[in-house]
Amino acid sequence: MFKDISIKDYDPDLYQAMVSETKRQESHIELIASENYCSQAVMEAQGSDLTNKYAEGYPGKRYYGGCEYVDIVEQLAIDRAKELFGAEYANVQPHAGSQANSAVFLALLEAGDTVLGMSLDAGGHLTHGAHVNFSGINYNAVQYGLVEETGLIDYDEVERLAQEHKPKMIIAGFSAYSQVVDWQRFRDIADSVGAYLFVDMAHVAGLVAAGVYPSPVPFADVVTTTTHKTLRGPRSGLILSRDDKLAKKLNSAVFPGNQGGPLMHAIAAKAVCFKEALQDDFKTYQQQVVKNAKAMAKVIQERGYEIISGGTENHLMLISLVKQEMTGKEADKWLGDAGITVNKNAVPNDPKSPFVTSGIRIGTPAITTRGFNEAQAADLAGWICDVLDSRGDEKVLADTRAKVEKICAELPVYERNQ
């Protein structure tokens, strides 16, 4: 039976949910900064026969037989990742960014060691020392933030906390910070206290690969990233290092320390996305991502909304709604009703709970993949402000929804759906 089974015939409930999600992606504008649309080739690799193969270990050193072809797949992914980011070492097995990060902790630290990372409400990530995450539960996590007046990373605070707490590892990187990070300053601070420098570049990896955002690889001991977001690949993880002497520790931390068998279909999809990112048109795409973000930020600021740190130099922006006495939860709902998907997000010193928040985060990778240019991005920013200004007025929502549907029809995600 299973040899000729189809989801449509065998599981109509699941099939309908999948079809509905396809329609949602085609008919909504995606502005969640961590989401993107991967290519048909990436999806082809991820849906391949490779999903059937177990391959514990690494190329040439497996615990299972029949790995001669998946060895080729994984080595292609490794070699392309190293070429793309100028690294001496790459591990393509982490199932996700969080798994990559936990492997770094396992490789470089002992339980209870002190780490210094960006706080969640300043734009950091759960795995950078948040008290509800393994990084804050199993380790002594100290958190740095932003300069209140500018919204920029408070490097003086980073240095002061490093001198005071002597962390074994300093974490740089972010999930909601829109400016350029000074990797050299972080390196200098880490060296001053003998700490490892670990950079999580998950949000800007595609920009880094294209050379439109400074690379942390020459400065950090270890770099991790997801492979979706700006990199436009499958939902998965990657570890890089300029120091191949760390290879054994990192490899052992991934397998057997943190994971069992690698997902060979996902690794194949990563190999495809790395090849795509090595092409000239990928640089053009990333340049447009930043242009679109800047165009949106300009309109949003002109309409009276505050962007934390004063603007954007990458693909995202964090909009504070404190002055408008509006919650991120409300804004998320209103925009969603208009066909525009964003996410509520905490802002620095947010008085609201993480389930409510006082801000929204938006990003341009997905709309740029779709084909938006600066003028269209600016128009979209205006629609967002119209919805927020109206506080969810039904007529404004309906008018905006009609505009969204029109441009989505003009710029489909995948031509197969036409």
UniProtKB/Swiss-Prot annotation:
Cystine crosslinks: none
Cited InterPro entries: PyrdxlP-dep_Trfase, PyrdxlP-dep_Trfase_major, PyrdxlP-dep_Trfase_small, Ser_HO-MeTrfase, Ser_HO-MeTrfase-like, Ser_HO-MeTrfase_PLP_BS, SHMT-like_dom
One family name in Pfam for this protein: SHMT
Class of enzymatic activity (EC top level): transferase
Required cofactor(s): pyridoxal 5'-phosphate
Main localization, broad class: cytoplasm
Keyword Ribosomal protein in annotation: no
SUPFAM superfamilies noted in UniProt: PLP-dependent transferases
Localisation: Cytoplasm
Listed pathway(s): One-carbon metabolism; tetrahydrofolate interconversion; Amino-acid biosynthesis; glycine biosynthesis; glycine from L-serine: step 1/1
Any one Gene Ontology BP term: tetrahydrofolate interconversion
Residues at the site labelled Plays an important role in substrate specificity: H228
Residues binding (6S)-5,6,7,8-tetrahydrofolate, per UniProt: L120, G124, H125, L126, S353, P354, F355
Any one cellular-component term (Gene Ontology): cytosol
Molecular-function GO terms, alphabetical: glycine hydroxymethyltransferase activity; pyridoxal phosphate binding
Residue numbers carrying N6-(pyridoxal phosphate)lysine: K229
Quaternary context: Homodimer.
Protein function: Catalyzes the reversible interconversion of serine and glycine with tetrahydrofolate (THF) serving as the one-carbon carrier. This reaction serves as the major source of one-carbon groups required for the biosynthesis of purines, thymidylate, methionine, and other important biomolecules. Also exhibits THF-independent aldolase activity toward beta-hydroxyamino acids, producing glycine and aldehydes, via a retro-aldol mechanism.
HAMAP family: SHMT (MF_00051)
The protein's name: Serine hydroxymethyltransferase
